[in-house]
Amino acid sequence: MTSKQAMSSNEQERLLCYNGEVLVFQLSKGNFADKEPTKTPILHVRRMVFDRGTKVFVQKSTGFFTIKEENSHLKIMCCNCVSDFRTGINLPYIVIEKNKKNNVFEYFLLILHSTNKFEMRLSFKLGYEMKDGLRVLNGPLILWRHVKAFFFISSQTGKVVSVSGNFSSIQWAGEIENLGMVLLGLKECCLSEEECTQEPSKSDYAIWNTKFCVYSLESQEVLSDIYIIPPAYSSVVTYVHICATEIIKNQLRISLIALTRKNQLISFQNGTPKNVCQLPFGDPCAVQLMDSGGGNLFFVVSFISNNACAVWKESFQVAAKWEKLSLVLIDDFIGSGTEQVLLLFKDSLNSDCLTSFKITDLGKINYSSEPSDCNEDDLFEDKQENRYLVVPPLETGLKVCFSSFRELRQHLLLKEKIISKSYKALINLVQGKDDNTSSAEEKECLVPLCGEEENSVHILDEKLSDNFQDSEQLVEKIWYRVIDDSLVVGVKTTSSLKLSLNDVTLSLLMDQAHDSRFRLLKCQNRVIKLSTNPFPAPYLMPCEIGLEAKRVTLTPDSKKEESFVCEHPSKKECVQIITAVTSLSPLLTFSKFCCTVLLQIMERESGNCPKDRYVVCGRVFLSLEDLSTGKYLLTFPKKKPIEHMEDLFALLAAFHKSCFQITSPGYALNSMKVWLLEHMKCEIIKEFPEVYFCERPGSFYGTLFTWKQRTPFEGILIIYSRNQTVMFQCLHNLIRILPINCFLKNLKSGSENFLIDNMAFTLEKELVTLSSLSSAIAKHESNFMQRCEVSKGKSSVVAAALSDRRENIHPYRKELQREKKKMLQTNLKVSGALYREITLKVAEVQLKSDFAAQKLSNL
């Protein structure tokens, strides 16, 4: 960014751009509000934004900073934007020099925050004046040159440090990813003895005695001195701007552009010149990159003669030039999302407002305060020629992009059509309707999936229809509630379902009347089991879906007889609810909507693949009118907290669940029920005595608890709260009444009993699988023994027939013994398919048991 100083008799002025705003810094001996100037120096700042309606810059806000130095001469050195190491945010800064009579120079670096408040980030004193080579880098870090040495000071250390590298000049300084703060400049290098024996010319000595190097300020060592700029350019390069860097085989490769004394803009890539542009003016001094959108990148070059030009990066041709400028800024001034260049002309800094300027992106965006008085030649005479060279490739690229876009659109439309038809066919199949959605032409285009034969489709339909069951057999009731921003749908199943439940999924398919597509809503499932027993032993099973511990009894013929741990005696009645919780906010975009509730049950039968069963539970209808009237909204009346049992299950499904193991080595935990009933004002739910409903006013109201005291000194406490804040409040209240040296442990995977049962189940499954291996071997051994007995019987018949000829018995007996010995030495083999099936089952079961053991060990 190029900024020039405009100075009057009693003030100094600098401008820069930040987030689309123009910041005007003024250092004066007075206040804007005071008519008479004072002796106290004041630094003022004005934020100005461009108004697209009036096409002028208007003042947005102001700020000031008082400098308590009356007898000193103050001067603005520079201003720009750098990153603060504390936050990593780019903020505007300004450097001020203070000179006293004793030739002591003090420097201040002030950072401007969004509230127009200044913060002094760095201050230091020097015995000399910084005249050239002043740069401010991220940190902030100030770098300058004095005599033939370079120095820097950082806001992190606050100490002046000299650069150890013997640089004759520094062309670029900045931060490179993974390398930190680096310098790029010319460094003097020593010639070899052979080169010193020769007598090179002055020009050759100037060229080959210096080399461009990349120097790290952190490690204070040279990172690279190759693949930068060839030595032949060392005497003519005046300015460098690094575009990109990468490390290839531990070697730094750099892509950069450079300005030369020959009035050229040269592009270098890995030390090789790629493009050259002859600039229209002399003495170039700075380069800025402008992205005007649509892949149009420009290099905006500023000149000492108050001129500027724009060079197109793609063709490396001059696109525009301007004369008689005072400042060139690049930012998104009009808020279009792309960058523009702001050209301030010479007379624009003489008043409080910007009077003479132009904003352009070298395309459609053009704003000018005085278009007739600018005296600028925006484009060269060969502008049309350059345009004709560029437009045809762009048109070809656009045609290719449009063709690809059309193909992609057709592909997406076909996918959407197939998915829509599949959803509709699935819903019709679930509801028992005839599926007439597919035409004969569409059916001909369909191909079987996974390499199946065509005749297998009918078999699949028969199996699928068998898997769909009537909801009256398994589902007793369906209900739904609205809690805060969640929709809770619950399904009460019959007692027979829980005895064979391995894995369930409750899905919601949204059906819109005006659209044939069905949308699967994202849901969070939970299985809740509550006991209706009046005695205090809790039977709330905090189990995950599909994880029920069961006891497997091994029999000699390797058949499994299963009895589930969660199966209680007939006196212990248990209510089972399967819930699905989904976000309500996306559904509010519809005035009313309908969802089909589908229950999927996956069962694993012995020795077979998992079998899926589908149950259509019903439909959920909800509208904005129902929500506004509070028809399904869950509330807590003061006199009757739980009006319906569905409300209780909705709370258990939607609330945040936390499980804690409480252990008291020295004292019995008799105070837990006192805490629940007296301190927390809990009421026991009559239908489910294990659940406590908190009626304490405030944020505690509505919180649910379950307490299972396993021993007098240990128990499991489960808290269902609206959020974690309420949960922490409950724990804070609980700690006050617990005995001394009491321990609380968060059980992230649920209660310990559940994990123990799950561990037992997985170990027993592993034993069953291993027994199948031994049973296969036993089966082959049994067949072998039967063959031996048959062979023995045949030999006895032969011996009886030849009893009258005893002289021939001995050879046959020897032959029989030889055959037995031969068969006993034969290796017993199991078929390869059976062996692979058994080993796969063993690996799966062992993996599950190891996972369960790991969870249990982490408690």
Swiss-Prot record:
Indicate where the modification N-acetylthreonine is found in the sequence: T2
Subcellular location, record wording? Nucleus
Q: Which GO terms describe its cellular component?
A: chromatin; cytosol; Fanconi anaemia nuclear complex; nucleoplasm
Membrane-spanning ranges: none
GO biological process terms on file: interstrand cross-link repair; negative regulation of double-strand break repair via homologous recombination; positive regulation of double-strand break repair via homologous recombination; replication-born double-strand break repair via sister chromatid exchange
For whether the record's keyword set contains rRNA-binding, the answer is: no
User: Its domain of life?
Assistant: Eukaryota
Entry keywords, A to Z: Acetylation, DNA damage, DNA repair, Fanconi anemia, Nucleus
InterPro entries found in the cross-reference section: FANCB
**Where this protein primarily resides, as one coarse class?**
nucleus
Q: What is the associated disease? A: Fanconi anemia complementation group B: A disorder affecting all bone marrow elements and resulting in anemia, leukopenia and thrombopenia. It is associated with cardiac, renal and limb malformations, dermal pigmentary changes, and a predisposition to the development of malignancies. At the cellular level it is associated with hypersensitivity to DNA-damaging agents, chromosomal instability (increased chromosome breakage) and defective DNA repair. Some severe FANCB cases manifest features of VACTERL syndrome with hydrocephalus.
- What job does this protein perform? DNA repair protein required for FANCD2 ubiquitination.
Subunit structure comment from the entry? Belongs to the multisubunit FA complex composed of FANCA, FANCB, FANCC, FANCE, FANCF, FANCG, FANCL/PHF9 and FANCM. The complex is not found in FA patients.
Q: What is this protein called?
A: Fanconi anemia group B protein
Species of provenance: Homo sapiens (Human)
